[in-house]
Amino acid sequence: MSSLDATTPRYDEFKRIYHLFLFHAHPFWLQLLYFLFISLLGFLMLKALPMKTSMVPRPMDLDLIFTSVSATTVSSMVAVEMESFSNSQLLLITLLMLLGGEVFTSILGLYFTNAKYSSKMIATLPDDDDHGGSGKPPPPTTSPSSTLVELELAPPMDVVVVNPTTTATTHDEVELGLGRRNKRGCTCTTTHTSSSSSASKTTTTRLLMFVVMGYHAVVHVAGYTAIVVYLSAVGGAGAVVAGKGISAHTFAIFTVVSTFANCGFVPTNEGMVSFRSFPGLLLLVMPHVLLGNTLFPVFLRLAIAALERVTGWPELGELLIRRRRGGGEGYHHLLPSSRTRFLALTVAVLVVAQLALFCAMEWGSDGLRGLTAGQKLVGALFMAVNSRHSGEMVLDLSTVSSAVVVLYVVMMYLPPYTTFVPVQDKHQQTGAQSGQEGSSSSSIWQKLLMSPLSCLAIFIVVICITERRQIADDPINYSVLNIVVEVISAYGNVGFSTGYSCARQVRPDGSCRDLWVGFSGKWSKQGKLTLMAVMFYGRLKKFSLHGGQAWKIE
């Protein structure tokens, strides 16, 4: 018999610890441990796999773990030249980006949410042997303290608050299975109602999980196929990839996964600069940035609506109806219809604003010299779309005017679902009021959290301290603006970087050699470690977006 057989006490103990860890731990700690584990495993595998050729020097361990963290947190901060990695290492980085992508991690969240509802449904089934013949009601399975633990599983963007002391059974309590008749005569729901509610949630959550999985798979397969066909049809683009010793299939799958996950890594040293004269490839890559991040809620709703029309399944329509009323299955990517429309409008306005400023300031710049008007327009649009969260560039950011760089910094700072909502829905106002009436302990901890701007200011100060010697000796490369760009880019998990150039040195160093790495790739060990902390903080920023409420500035 196996030591973990389903009938052994050891299996029961393992199952109990498993449920305690996954269903009672705060999502922040679960996700932090997940990203740390994937980053460490990726580093060990990158170190074990051979480099592209024996002539390529093996990077330092710090640079390899920096690359692993950058891929897992989808930040694309480059510390090692991408063309020095072997095909197996590139495929490993592809896997790290896939595992760290927001859509993929949300699928994992749906899986564990479904498991939680299934466990709750089994736990609330009536036991006739224990209670049916005794005439006694079944013991309550939910206490105020356990209610608080379960509610901590709700995503930070969709907070559900229930007051366990209220005497009236609200709709939320019915949904969560908290209503029950007690000895004081409180009008409550039965165990059967709770079980039915859990069964309904299990069905809809599982359905939503399969829809998102299908969306994820279809986008990747379609993107991979389109890029492979383009490289085969357009000889110039295919020659660029082949000339760098990269397989067309590896390039296609790497680029699609990186772009959809909004990482921004490209298997060429120059990034997408090598393909700025191929607007067709840029137009094929560009939609994946929006499909996997800023417009994911929009296309997810469209996909669900299309599937409902084709299949006629009422459960799909129920998902959209619940979200229209402010409900849903705790999946914060499935926004209400009104919020989705405003999100699409906001994204379009921000892209147009960036496009207009870039064309006005950079149309005749050296970075776009030699391109046709159409190629310049596509390149400008590509930069505008990527500035939010992907970070793929078609020109050297250090050559761009300061006004455009500052605008990019603002865009990198904004969360993906930043929305201009002139009129707030009634259910959103009700949710905000109920959130204010939540537990005092949760409110206190939220208020004690520092705001993202405060944390970023501290990180910038720390990096200015760790790099103070380089700032004094090389003030152009190590300008404060370049440091701010690098930190905000790491926080936004974007990957924009001004790079480092030996030509910009005030005191030329004969031993200096230009490398195709980001600006942070030249930082000290302390600076790189600090930036890795920024990457983790940025990847988990959804848990601290409402921090800093204790400060009152008047």
Curated annotation (Swiss-Prot):
Gene Ontology MF term list: monoatomic cation transmembrane transporter activity
Region (Disordered): 127-147
Transmembrane segment boundaries: 26-46, 90-110, 208-230, 280-300, 342-362, 403-423, 444-464, 518-538
Main localization, broad class: membrane
Cell compartment(s), UniProt: Cell membrane
Keyword terms: Cell membrane, Ion transport, Membrane, Sodium, Sodium transport, Stress response, Transmembrane, Transmembrane helix, Transport
Tissue: In roots, expressed in cells next to the protoxylem and the metaxylem I. In basal nodes, expressed in the phloem of some diffuse vascular bundles.
Stretches assigned to the Cytoplasmic side: 1-25, 111-207, 301-341, 424-443, 539-554
UniProt cross-references to Pfam families, sorted A to Z: TrkH (PF02386)
Record-level GO cellular component terms: plasma membrane
BP GO terms, sorted: regulation of sodium ion transmembrane transporter activity; sodium ion transmembrane transport
InterPro entries referenced in this protein's UniProt entry, alphabetically: Cat_transpt, TrkH_K-transport
Reactions it catalyzes: Na(+)(in) = Na(+)(out)
Entry membrane topology: Multi-pass membrane protein
Family in the record: Belongs to the TrkH potassium transport family. HKT (TC 2.A.38.3) subfamily.
Role description: Sodium transporter that under salt stress mediates sodium exclusion in the phloem to prevent sodium transfer to young leaf blades and reproductive tissues.
Miscellaneous comment: Substitution of Pro-140, Arg-184, His-332 and Leu-395 in salt-tolerant cultivars indica Nona Bokra and Pokkali confers enhanced sodium transport activity.
Comment block on domains: HKT transporters are proposed to contain 4 pore-forming regions enclosed by transmembrane segments with each containing a potassium channel-like selectivity filter motif.
Protein name: Cation transporter HKT1;5
Organism this protein belongs to: Oryza sativa subsp. japonica (Rice)
